[in-house]
Swiss-Prot record:
It comes from Streptococcus equi subsp. equi (strain 4047). The active site is at D312 (proton acceptor). This is 3-phosphoshikimate 1-carboxyvinyltransferase. Belongs to the EPSP synthase family. One of its GO terms (cellular component) is cytoplasm. The keyword NAD does not apply. Pathway: Metabolic intermediate biosynthesis; chorismate biosynthesis; chorismate from D-erythrose 4-phosphate and phosphoenolpyruvate: step 6/7. Catalyzes the transfer of the enolpyruvyl moiety of phosphoenolpyruvate (PEP) to the 5-hydroxyl of shikimate-3-phosphate (S3P) to produce enolpyruvyl shikimate-3-phosphate and inorganic phosphate. GO terms for molecular function: 3-phosphoshikimate 1-carboxyvinyltransferase activity. GO terms for biological process: amino acid biosynthetic process; aromatic amino acid family biosynthetic process; chorismate biosynthetic process.
Length: 427
């Protein structure tokens, strides 16, 4: 598709879709809790729809009302064997978290994914879940999907140190541990997003968190809840970037999630000199209204324990770096190479083809700015975040046309992305 270029300014107010990470977990916990769960603000992107369909295939009743999703929870013991493989689509979150949950069931299930998901390593979950007593098998050394999970109703508790900073791996172990007799202890390499821990407590479960150590005793029973999901900071990130780098822009984003384990991007914006302010802060719901406007940015270094708190925002941060004065270094981000695509390579390829001075390193990128961007024919590589990064980058293009292949990948997390762009466009 041809992307909009030569933006004069973006202005207006916007509500981004519900948080993808929280939406997945809300559906999962609603299904395994006892009683009804009502979810408001759910993201209805393709990834979350895959999670919903998986639980329908496992015998859970899920239906929609005008503004909510209603789940009739069956408890941990109420899931039924699926009559066919569960299709996770493009969603690594769905596959890894469901593998953890299903590791304690008394039936076997096959988890499938699309071409992109079928290249993502699952050994990071098969190893700890196998230590607990489940049988999991994928393809090759890295246990690539399809993944067969043969559950065990008498899992063993484990003490496990995560070899990578991954909220998905942590969550898979926690979902298994909730069904396991005894205490499981997880030690994180770096602090990662804590939505699963928060949701366990929200549904009436108990766990203990001390720094990077999480302890949980099972088995537990959970109770259905009513949830309000905030807007996704990872989706808001693209509009925050647009507001900062498109001259004359002034944007207000309402009801954006600001969980502290996710706000690394906001800290980076401030360090780069971006004009950003917080309004209507709701500490209980961890949400706020964010206001940004066009800014003069400077290059910085991004590394260490900040990386897990902005891992999904690094593509758009790389775009910001192309419009910042000086050099921006992104380090310690090798996890980007095993996302929906190799995001280090994809980001440097796309922005490089558009004229940016950007080089890939083994664990990140080096970007020298400020550089003008020009037209190019590029691809999302099937990755929604690469697609949205490119659409925002195209707004700066004054010469040439930007064409984007496989733009449908954006439907994974932001079905109305281009509609929202039209709303903010000012000639």
């Amino acid at each position: 598709m041809k992307l909009k270029t030569k933006a004069k300014a973006l202005r207006g107010r916007l509500r981004v879709p519900g948080d993808k990470s929280i939406s997945h977990r809300a559906v999962i916990f609603g299904a395994i809790a006892e009683g009804q769960t009502v979810i408001h603000g759910l993201l209805r992107g393709q990834d979350v729809l895959a999670t919903i369909q998986a639980f329908r295939d496992l015998g859970v009743t899920i239906y929609e009302s005008a503004d909510s999703l209603i789940i009739e929870g069956r408890g941990f013991k109420g899931l039924k064997p699926a009559q066919k493989p569960l299709d996770m689509g493009n969603s690594g979150t769905s596959m890894r978290l469901l593998a953890g949950l299903l590791a304690a069931q008394d039936f076997s299930v096959q988890l499938l994914g699309d071409d992109s998901l079928s290249r993502r390593p699952m050994d990071r979950i098969t190893i700890p879940l196998s230590l607990m007593g489940a049988e999991l098998s994928g393809q090759g050394e890295k246990e690539l999907p399809p993944l067969i999970v043969k559950g065990c109703q008498e899992l063993r508790p484990i003490h496990y140190q995560l070899p990578v900073a991954s909220a998905q791996v942590k969550s898979a172990i926690l979902l298994a541990a909730l069904q396991t007799q005894g205490e499981t202890v997880i030690l994180e390499k770096e602090l990662t997003r804590n939505h699963t821990e928060e949701m366990i407590e929200q549904f009436g479960g108990k766990l203990s968190v001390a720094g990077k150590q999480i302890s949980i005793k099972g088995p537990q029973r959970l109770q259905g809840q009513t949830l309000q999901i905030p807007g996704d900071l990872s989706s808001a990130a693209f509009w925050l970037a647009a507001g900062l780098i498109v001259p004359g822009s002034d944007l207000v984003l309402e009801n954006v999630g600001i969980n502290p384990t996710r706000t690394g991007l906001l800290e980076v914006i401030e360090k780069m000199g971006g004009r950003i302010s917080y309004q209507a802060v709701d500490k209980d719901r961890q949400a706020a209204t964010l206001k940004v406007s066009y800014s003069t940015l400077k290059g910085i270094e991004i590394s260490g324990d900040l990386i897990p708190r902005l891992i999904d925002e690094l593509p758009v941060i790389a775009l910001l770096a192309t419009q910042a004065q000086g050099t921006t270094y992104i380090r310690d981000a090798q996890e980007l190479r095993v996302k929906e695509t190799d995001r280090i390579q994809a980001v440097t390829d796309v922005l490089g083809q558009m004229g940016a001075d950007i080089q890939a390193t083994e664990d990140g990128m080096v970007t020298r700015g400020k550089t003008p961007l020009h037209g190019a024919a590029v691809s999302t590589c099937g990755d929604h975040r690469i697609g949205m990064m490119t659409a925002i980058a195209a707004l700066l293009v004054e010469e040439g046309q930007v064409t984007l292949e496989r733009a449908e990948a954006i439907l994974t997390s932001y079905p109305d992305f281009f509609k929202d762009l039209e709303r903010l466009w000012h000639d």
